[in-house]
Design a protein with these regions (language model features):
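Conserved glycine-rich Rossmann-like NAD(P)H-binding loop of the short-chain dehydrogenase/reductase
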Residues: 33-41
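Substrate-positioning beta->alpha
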Residues: 169-187
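N-terminal Rossmann NAD(P)H-binding glycine-rich loop of SDR-like oxidoreductase domains
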Residues: 8-33
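Flexible, glycine-rich beta-alpha linker
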Residues: 129-133, 153-175
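Conserved Rossmann-fold NAD(P)-dependent oxidoreductase catalytic core, especially the SDR/UDP-sugar
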Residues: 34, 92-149, 153-156
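Structural motif
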Residues: 10, 76-77, 117
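NAD(P)H-binding glycine-rich loop region in Rossmannoid oxidoreductase-like domains
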Residues: 43, 53-101, 105, 109, ...
Length: 188
């Protein structure tokens, strides 16, 4: 099975088990890329079976620099979809760590391994200094990407889920279209 993977360019995908990632991974495959899903340990079961058999899965932690370094090694691009819409104090993960620190780790790893292409999915309304901690952290992470030396593309879609409870708000067609644009932009 893995010999078939040798002809593909591998793309690290964070957030591949989330609502958007479920559409991005198949789009990347259609465009001739091999997604390497960087997933939290224990969330591997959330990957759709048809996607799992056509990608690689690397468990890791975006907030741990060494983990991201290992996950990114050997990839040609990074699609950073991972996001947390609700702070998780019991697990000790504030927005700042989940978004800003994780994005800094992605940028560091890209630099370390010579990865030049980064696709970053932010959110409409994100800006550093926003009174809402979510939009503040997303804005700070986006500013890190924009200040990097990478060839980057930032997507700023409207939230496709309810920020209060995480329930999906967007139609599958919206997510499919966004996923297609993301996959197409990896080639640029």
């Amino acid at each position: 099975m893995y010999s078939a993977f040798m002809q593909y360019k591998e793309v690290l995908v964070t957030g591949g088990t989330g609502p958007l990632g479920r559409y991005v991974c198949p789009s990347l495959i259609v465009h001739g890329f091999l997604p390497r899903l960087f997933v939290r340990l224990g969330s591997e079961g959330r990957i759709a079976p048809d996607v799992r058999e056509r990608c690689r899965v690397t468990p890791g932690d975006l907030t741990v620099r060494e983990s991201v370094e290992m996950g990114a090694q050997g990839t040609s691009a990074i699609v950073h979809l991972a996001e947390m819409w609700k702070e998780q104090p019991p697990r000790g993960i504030p927005f700042e760590e989940a978004h800003v620190h994780a994005t800094a780790n992605i940028l560091h790893s890209a630099s370390l391994w010579g990865i030049r292409r980064l696709i970053f999915v932010s959110v409409a309304g994100a800006r550093p200094g926003d009174t809402d901690p979510y939009f503040d952290a997303r804005g700070k992470a986006e500013a890190l990407v924009r200040g990097s030396q990478l060839s980057w593309t930032v997507f700023r879609p409207a939230p496709w889920y309810d920020l209060r409870d995480g329930a999906p708000r967007a139609s599958p067609k919206y997510l499919e279209g966004l996923a297609e644009a993301i996959a197409e932009s990896v080639r640029r």
